[in-house]
Amino acid sequence: MKIQLVTPAPLKLNNGNKITAVRWAGIFKKLGQRVRVTQNYDGKPCDVLIALHARRSADSIRRFHELHPALPLIVVLTGTDIYRDIRHDLNAQRSLEIASRLVVLQKMALREIPKPLRRKTRVIYQSAEPIRASRSRANGIFDVCVVGHLRGEKDPLRAAMAVRDLPSQSRIQVTHIGLALDPRLEKTAKQEIRRNPRYRWIGHLSHGKTRQRLARSDLVCITSKMEGSSNVLSEALASRVPVVASRISGLMGTLGNRFPGYFPVGDTERLKALLLKAESQPKFYRDLTRYCARLSDRVKPKREIEAWRRLLAQFA
């Protein structure tokens, strides 16, 4: 089977969509398929089109369907699709209607899909290979890692704000990895570095180096306002690094309702209290670590591979 995988993200940009597309291309090859990854549908022959992003890939989805109405078309919904665009954007809504199958990346996203379309929707959790790295407390630092480009949906400076005025005995330090995609947020981040000795923004790292840095941290902090799912969350769970996360559907669909590390979106004081609790209360930190470790099975690559195998087999 020849698969064309369309992702609207520039292939040189190291973001979630790019990471997802590269991982899926590897999965399809393991399943014995031939795959090409492009930003747009280019009209070249393929047996199935898989498009990431209902709105941003809408032109590719429409063109493929017009040219090949009998061929399978799989549309993968992102966070902005699920929690914004499919409610109001006609192009996104049309993408859902004409797709042979829809894919969402965590179970709570199903609630947002129009009821008549849920029967053709599949949940496929994002996976990650485990990376083991030693965490050294020799320097006394409690290392909190934030991974996310500087753009509004990520609320990327929330962790920095939460550690501004911690008690002097706290050893929390926040390390932030990500590109500046918003000039205003870039300016704010640079100001934050000058005023906040607990915050470091180190900019872009390769995906491999980012994963190593994440695996060495004591805690991963995910502050997003909107997510379809999160590669960073899957990578933290795979490496058994405990997480604190904003209470949003896109994260709750993987973490579950009983996860003890939630804070309300944008609530700096609640996040501050949660970070201090993780640092200063060993029992809470152990409970958080154990909860996240139990979820590591959910993000194992073999589960994602099998889910895609079952889906593609429907069109073989």
Task: Describe these PLM feature segments.
Residues G16, S280-A313:
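A charged, aromatic-enriched C-terminal amphipathic alpha-helix characteristic of glycosyltransferases
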Residues I19, R151-D165, R184-K187, E269:
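A conserved mid-protein helix/loop that constitutes part of the nucleotide-sugar donor-binding site
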Residues E97-I131:
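A short, active-site helix/loop in glycosyltransferases that binds the activated sugar's phosphate group
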Residues R135-R164, V174-I177:
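Conserved donor-binding/catalytic core segment of Leloir-type glycosyltransferases
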Residues Q173-K187, W201-H204:
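Glycosyltransferase donor-sugar binding loop
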Residues K225:
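Aromatic "clamp/platform" in nucleotide-sugar-dependent glycosyltransferases that forms part
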Residues P242-A245:
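Short hydrophobic beta-strand element within catalytic cores of glycosyltransferases
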Residues N257-E269, K277-K283:
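Conserved acidic donor-binding segment of nucleotide-sugar-dependent glycosyltransferases
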